[in-house]
């Protein structure tokens, strides 16, 4: 699960945090310790009705680095076998499907004109909006989180703690910035965000950066977590999931760290911070921030104060994804292919749906048509409320 490596080698050390491994080095499911056993699914009083609207096959497999991108009425998605495609949001119909002719480790990011994916050896591959390969370029190390595309650039975060931008038209490297990294890093479902000309990215060690997408200059830096402890494992922390932005607020959560909301209109001043440890990520609405902790206990925090509003422990150890919003519910996927819907107001279980295809690893996406899920077997599933 961990490996030590020589200085300068990509991912100087890595901890794999997937649906089947605990950081203790033991399988959660084979352990005799009841603390790590997934909660059994229990009966509940349904509070909403959900259904599968459509299913579409992208390719084979899934992974932490594979979160589909939704733009308008289109979905861009990829799978580890090299499959890449564009799909209609309303029906799931494939508009185009292509192949990267390589195994993939991350994808797909898109701005509607350029769609980018990445390989385990750091190759970045861009497609035009007909599915034809546009260019190939090389990052300095492996890329394990989805690229982001916009403002004329394709941006990737590589395993040597570099954030790099390539010209979206021809693949020319535009800029590269690097921060010193910790001895161990987390392989997590991290995501970058592009907003108002800035690349918002977390880094191993608990930092959150806002980077000018045109120049690579760091415009702002915040601390989500501070490594603590005597050993490298105790000091392991990383910003997980996607940073969330709503108005003047930017919120993020870290493994072995905190959940924090910053005021971007006041130079990134922290508004509140609570000790918290998540392995997947968070989502926010106009009232609350929602996040599962590393044991899959879901909590809601008041967005203005950080006060804990509710906790839901009925899904404990089910390896929940980052949440998505659907109506008055919060949706999370789990290791058996179920999507659970919790009340935003009090956390009670409202609905449950099996979408099949094995463990859901990439976070569900809120769309105008419902919640989009990429399954463990490489399919897209649209879930709608009746």
Swiss-Prot record:
Q: Which cysteines are joined by disulfide bonds?
A: none
List the membrane topology term(s).
Answer: Lipid-anchor
Renumbered to this chain, the positions carrying a covalent lipid of the kind S-diacylglycerol cysteine are 26
- Signal peptide range in chain numbering: 1-25
Report the SMART domains cross-referenced here: PQQ (SM00564)
N-palmitoyl cysteine: lipidated positions: 26
Q: Enumerate the InterPro entries for this protein.
A: BamB, PQQ_b-propeller_rpt, PQQ_rpt_dom, Quinoprotein_ADH-like_sf, WD40/YVTN_repeat-like_dom_sf
Location in the cell reads: Cell outer membrane
Superkingdom of the source species: Bacteria
Q: Name one Pfam family in it.
A: PQQ_2
| GO cellular component, as recorded | cell outer membrane
| Record keywords | Cell outer membrane, Lipoprotein, Membrane, Palmitate, Signal
Q: Its family? A: Belongs to the BamB family.
* Quaternary organization: Part of the Bam complex.
Query: What name does UniProt use for this protein?
Result: Outer membrane protein assembly factor BamB
The organism of origin for this protein = Bordetella pertussis (strain Tohama I / ATCC BAA-589 / NCTC 13251)
């Amino acid at each position: 699960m961990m490996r030590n490596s020589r200085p300068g080698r990509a991912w100087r050390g890595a901890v794999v945090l997937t649906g089947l491994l605990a950081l203790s080095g033991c399988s959660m499911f084979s352990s005799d310790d009841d603390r790590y056993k997934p909660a059994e699914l229990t009966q509940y009083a349904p509070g909403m009705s959900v259904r599968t609207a459509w299913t579409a096959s992208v390719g084979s497999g899934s992974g932490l680095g594979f979160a589909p991108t939704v733009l308008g009425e289109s979905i861009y998605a990829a799978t580890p076998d090299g499959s890449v495609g564009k799909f209609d949001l309303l029906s799931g119909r494939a508009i185009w499907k292509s192949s990267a002719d390589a195994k993939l480790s991350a994808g797909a990011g898109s701005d509607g004109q350029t769609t980018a994916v990445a390989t385990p050896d750091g190759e970045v591959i861009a497609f035009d909006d007909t599915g034809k390969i546009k260019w190939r370029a090389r990052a300095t190390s492996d890329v394990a989180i989805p690229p982001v595309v916009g403002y004329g650039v394709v941006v990737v975060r590589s395993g040597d703690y570099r954030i790099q931008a390539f010209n979206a038209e021809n693949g020319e490297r535009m800029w590269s910035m690097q921060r010193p990294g910790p001895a161990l890093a987390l392989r997590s479902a991290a995501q970058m965000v592009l907003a108002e000309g800035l690349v918002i990215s977390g880094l191993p060690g608990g930092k959150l950066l806002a980077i000018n997408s045109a120049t690579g200059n760091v415009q702002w830096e915040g601390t989500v977590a501070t490594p603590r402890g005597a050993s490298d494992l105790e000091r392991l922390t990383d910003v997980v999931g996607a940073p969330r932005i709503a108005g003047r607020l930017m919120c993020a959560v870290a493994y072995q760290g905190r959940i924090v909301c910053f005021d971007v209109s006041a130079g990134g001043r922290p508004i509140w911070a609570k000790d918290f440890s998540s392995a997947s990520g968070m989502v926010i609405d106009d009232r609350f921030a929602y996040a599962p902790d590393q044991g899959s206990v879901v909590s809601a925090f008041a967005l203005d104060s950080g006060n804990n509003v509710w906790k839901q422990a009925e899904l404990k150890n089910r390896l929940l994804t980052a949440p998505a919003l659907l109506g008055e519910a919060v949706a999370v996927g789990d290791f058996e292919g179920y999507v659970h819907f919790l009340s935003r107001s009090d956390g009670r279980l409202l609905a449950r749906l099996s979408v099949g295809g094995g463990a859901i690893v990439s976070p569900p996406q809120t769309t105008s048509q419902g919640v989009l899920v990429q399954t463990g077997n490489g399919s897209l599933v649209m879930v709608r409320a009746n």
